[in-house]
Amino acid sequence: MFTSTGSNGLYKAPLSKSLLLVPSAISILLTLLFQHYQKFFAYNLQAIKEDFQIWRLVCGRVICLDLKDTFCSSLLIYNFRIFERRYGSRKFSSFLLGAWTLSALFDLLLVEAAQYVFGITINSLPSGFLGPVFALFVPFYCSIPRVQVTQVLGYFSITNKTLVYILGLQLLTSGSYIWILALSGLISGICYNSSILKVHRILCVPSWVAKIFSWTLEPIFSSAEPTNEIRVGMGATVDIQRQQRMELLDRQIMMSQVAQMRRQRQQQGGMINWNRLFPPLRHRHNENYQDHHPSDQDTPPPTEVSEEQVARLMEMGFSRGDALEALRASNNDLNVATNFLLQH
């Protein structure tokens, strides 16, 4: 996965692990062995409205009856486990509870709106825990920094978030009316993430409930700390931990900028400089913003590089050109430049 979600695995993410294992196992059993029980997990809106089978709002919105939806939603939950590590299990479960409740309301409203505006009668929707999964795209888009990983054809950027969006698009196109679940999930995610009408205070998991689950279920779904990864020191306070996380993301962004500089240098070393013939969109945007004034005059002078640091990198076996690029991009930070050169 391209997403920067900390350590691999499900360490410090017991709720995400339970959402991966339990619904997926039930979905596989219903598909392979107990097909005659699938009717109890169908998201039948007609039965809810006409026969007042309110229990279908619960059963029909937890277990996926399509294995493709199970697979895609499981991958997305695995990527979104970063929010449980960041917020804690209680706050993460409160977000899922609020998004799940609000999306149930928006499902019914959107179905009625589709029938009133477009004349489309929708009697059933895809089953599964899909509303909260789509709702998690809201904090993912707002709070996870975009770090470039590579480029395709020199213009299409592949970032640490690209694969997650592709999975969301695959899930969106897996059913005919799943767009209603996606739209209701996004709306509920916006409402909860923006604290509209203080829903985060109303739809939350009480502390005593969180303690009960932490005593009973958390030991079952907790994962051991990865032993094959380099241990990173953790600050004693939340502010220090947040600062450490921001420093790590700054280093990732800086390294992606260095990689972009190296690719541009390789492109300019070819027979045709395609950047001069077809400038990237961000350069065109800057030119339009500056009213087509030449940008060469406003370009800041390059950062002066210490020859002593260049010599130290060359002693390690790196070329002078690579050492200069890494030091310029890292503002003469020898450690960051060395880490980048060792990884590329």
Swiss-Prot record:
Bias type Basic and acidic residues, positions: 286-296
UBA domain residues: 304-344
Cytoplasmic side: 112-123, 184-344
Pfam families in alphabetical order: UBA
Glycosylation sites: 160
Primary localization class, coarse: endoplasmic reticulum
Residues in the signal sequence: 1-34
Transmembrane domains' residue ranges: 92-111, 124-142, 163-183
Subcellular location: Endoplasmic reticulum membrane
Claim: Signal is one of the keywords in the record: yes
Region (Disordered): 284-307
Protein topology in the membrane: Multi-pass membrane protein
UniProtKB keywords: Endoplasmic reticulum, Glycoprotein, Membrane, Signal, Transmembrane, Transmembrane helix, Wnt signaling pathway
A single Gene Ontology CC term: endoplasmic reticulum membrane
InterPro entries linked: Rhomboid-like_sf, UBA, UBA-like_sf, UBA_UBAC2
Extracellular-side segments: 35-91, 143-162
PANTHER family assigned to the protein according to its UniProt record, in alphabetical order: RHOMBOID-RELATED PROTEIN, UBIQUITIN-ASSOCIATED DOMAIN-CONTAINING PROTEIN 2
Function according to Swiss-Prot or TrEMBL: Restricts trafficking of FAF2 from the endoplasmic reticulum to lipid droplets. May negatively regulate the canonical Wnt signaling pathway in the lymphocytes.
The protein, known as: Ubiquitin-associated domain-containing protein 2
